[in-house]
């Protein structure tokens, strides 16, 4: 019996790395995703979206949100690197899963897609609040728009929105423009103004508002116009990414296949922009796009190749760093003209924009300031949609040694002149005083 226990323990130790599928900086798409559903029928009703993920190499693990065996970790190691929650009405997750464990999941650098709907539970609302998003407090409210609705909803309550106010970012939504409007039916949310990490990806039109479509308005709605966000994203400081949608139907086969014509527009589209929208958005949230890595930070004196242990004030130096972007299949050279380096001690004494050879190498040269102390080379790069880069390397700077100063300092020439003039004047005065009567 003892031998059997030891064997099981050994097998667990060897299998654990295979189960964890921890996020790899060198291979961002080698990932396993847990999909939590209210009903397993969503697996077929949202099959187009799930199949696009599978076709890109993701391993999806479908489970009911109330499954008693739910767990994100085993033996202190995460089993998944991505989490999709399509369970808006779930009041309580099964197993060891709760809002805190999901927050810890994101804090560990992993990614989340959270989708709410009408009558979203307090659990789902709480998770969204943790991510900087607040859903309408009225659980029966939906987004209504009497001017930007889909013409297929012309005789309805105008809750099927044809939205086309998309974030202008090739990194988040891809380089190919989404021509057709995105169909949306769901709840509105607003962004927490104190959270600068959250961004609207799909916004409502100025004529939209959030209210119960089955009852008359007795007071002005709390959420109106462009302040309503339909889909938002967040990139945490640890580069974990989160997508928050107010509609599960947004990802459904029915809306993906549906034709669309926006009210008041002559343009008709055989297919909505939903598939392109959710596909491109999923590429971003799962780090298939906009994922940077940097390394090989090198510095040395001009004309040398070895990195010194210390610099002297007014030394001429060269600095370089390599930056690459994940293309979805391989690392490609990152090309940009806004990467900067700081030569930093309490504040930046030198701030230089780096030149690039378009092969991933960014470089510059500058003179060490006439200040000695402990400095840092710092590269802090933050750009919309891209992972944040933060690199630093410490280096001391010393003053001149006593035998390194110039023999005669040009700026001291006036003082030299004053000294010799005084001596000459004293000699003349003494001669005149002693020998002249």
Curated annotation (Swiss-Prot):
Its main location: endoplasmic reticulum. One of its GO terms (cellular component) is Golgi apparatus. The chain crosses the membrane at residues 415-435. Residues 1-24 form the signal peptide. It is a single-pass type I membrane protein. GO terms for biological process: plant-type cell wall organization; protein N-linked glycosylation via asparagine; unidimensional cell growth. Disruption phenotype: Embryo-lethal. Keywords: Endoplasmic reticulum, Membrane, Signal, Transmembrane, Transmembrane helix. It is found in: Endoplasmic reticulum membrane. InterPro entries: DDOST_48_kDa_subunit, OST48_MD, OST48_N. Residues 436-437 are cytoplasmic. Residues 25-414 are lumenal. Belongs to the DDOST 48 kDa subunit family. Component of the oligosaccharyltransferase (OST) complex. This is Dolichyl-diphosphooligosaccharide--protein glycosyltransferase 48 kDa subunit. It comes from Arabidopsis thaliana (Mouse-ear cress).
């Amino acid at each position: 019996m003892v031998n059997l226990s030891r064997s099981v323990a050994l097998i667990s130790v060897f299998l654990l790395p295979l189960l964890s599928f921890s996020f790899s900086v060198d291979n961002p798409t080698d990932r396993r995703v847990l999909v939590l559903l209210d009903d397993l029928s969503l697996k077929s009703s949202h099959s187009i979206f799930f199949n696009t993920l599978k076709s890109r190499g993701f391993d999806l693990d479908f489970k009911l949100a109330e499954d008693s065996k739910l767990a994100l970790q085993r033996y202190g190691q995460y089993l998944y690197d991505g989490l999709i929650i399509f369970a808006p009405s779930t009041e309580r997750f099964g197993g060891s899963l709760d809002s805190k464990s999901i927050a810890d999941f994101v804090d560990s650098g992993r990614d989340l897609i959270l989708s709410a709907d009408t009558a979203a539970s307090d659990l789902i609302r709480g998770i969204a609040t943790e991510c900087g998003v607040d859903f309408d407090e009225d659980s029966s409210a939906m987004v209504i728009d009497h001017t930007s609705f889909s013409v297929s909803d012309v005789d309805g309550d105008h809750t099927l929105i044809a939205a086309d106010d998309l974030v202008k970012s090739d990194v988040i939504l891809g380089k190919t423009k989404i021509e057709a409007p995105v169909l949306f039916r769901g709840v509105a949310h607003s962004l927490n103004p104190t959270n600068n990490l959250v961004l609207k990806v799909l916004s409502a039109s100025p004529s939209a508002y959030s209210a119960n479509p089955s009852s008359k308005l007795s007071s002005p709605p709390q959420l109106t116009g462009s302040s309503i966000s339909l889909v938002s994203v967040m990139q945490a400081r640890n580069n974990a990414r989160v997508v928050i949608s107010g509609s599960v139907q947004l990802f459904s086969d029915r809306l993906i296949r549906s034709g669309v014509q926006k009210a008041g527009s002559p343009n008709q589209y055989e297919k909505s922009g939903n598939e392109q929208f959710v596909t491109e958005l999923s590429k971003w949230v799962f780090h298939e796009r906009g994922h940077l890595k940097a390394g090989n930070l090198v510095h040395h004196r001009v004309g040398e190749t070895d990195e010194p242990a210390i610099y002297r004030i007014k030394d001429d130096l060269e600095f370089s760093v390599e930056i690459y972007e994940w293309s979805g299949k391989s690392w490609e050279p990152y090309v940009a003209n806004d990467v900067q380096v700081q030569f930093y001690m309490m504040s930046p004494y030198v701030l230089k924009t780096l030149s690039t050879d378009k092969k991933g190498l960014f470089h510059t040269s500058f003179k060490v300031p006439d200040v000695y102390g402990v400095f840092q080379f710092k590269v802090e790069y933050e750009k919309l949609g891209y992972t944040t880069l933060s690199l630093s390397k410490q280096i001391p700077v010393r003053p001149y040694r006593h035998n390194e100063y110039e023999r005669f300092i040009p700026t001291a020439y006036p003082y030299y002149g004053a000294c010799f003039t005084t001596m000459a004047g004293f000699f003349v005065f003494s001669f005149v005083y002693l020998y002249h009567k």
